[in-house]
Amino acid sequence: MDQKILWAVNKMPKTDDKNLPIMGLEEIKKARTFHESFPQYSETPLTKLPHMASYLGVKEVYVKDESYRFGLNAFKVLGGSFAMARYIAKETGKDVSELPYSVLTSEQLRKEFGQATFFTATDGNHGRGVAWAANRLGQKAVVHMPKGTTQTRLQNIAKEGAQVDIQELNYDDCVRLAAKEADETPRGVIVQDTAWDGYEEIPAWIMQGYGTMAMEAGEQLKAQGCERPTHIFVQAGVGSLAGAVVGYFSNLYADNLPTFVVVEAEAAACLYKGAAAGESGAAPFGALAAMMTMDEYKDLRN
């Protein structure tokens, strides 16, 4: 039985800023250059799917495969690692372009900056990315996971040297716990991929980190003869990836925008409901959300 796809035109209020400067081409080039400085870096593939294109009756279909990213099977590490670099740059009075991997891991930087403890909440990939980056950069990480998280996910994070636990809390309460502990810890920092009032700078840096993936994809499309895609599809998640992808490509193709489609599951459709209603809110607890151990999915806040 075919399942119907629900869709809505985005009715959220528009801003005067149509290009989202934080995702500007020069800003994202800094993120890309930073990630390229890691010895483990390589571009992930953009795969052409000719049979899918033929089946759908369109000219071309491409998929960006992030399963190869830094050996972590997910794009999330791009955001956490760049946010750490931006934070260290801010604390040391430098531009992030002055802090490639070789400098961040140097004895001189250790003397100048020392160590911070980066706190986060996760149901998997974001926390693993934060733990991986902290481990590589000589920093500390504390990761809280919500009730119902699998031991495999916990072990993957523990292998990266982080302090990690599974709390008897839902995802949102784990975020609150991480933020509280970061505030109470000397040199504690909350690195979360969702934003709230008063906490927007680090999520913006995380979005810029995701821009590396988008920049790669734009270059790979061009190399395969596609100057501009007609449509770009991206999963909603908690909103930061969607905001990053739309923001970057809105700058790259500013004179002729593609159609952007943000996709999410019907059981956790808060962005869809927000777009249809024209205002932000919270989606009710759904079956898919329960499976993913998240009490509710928040609307895009950045």
Please give the residue ranges for each predicted region.
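PLP-dependent amino-acid enzyme catalytic core
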Residues: 1-302
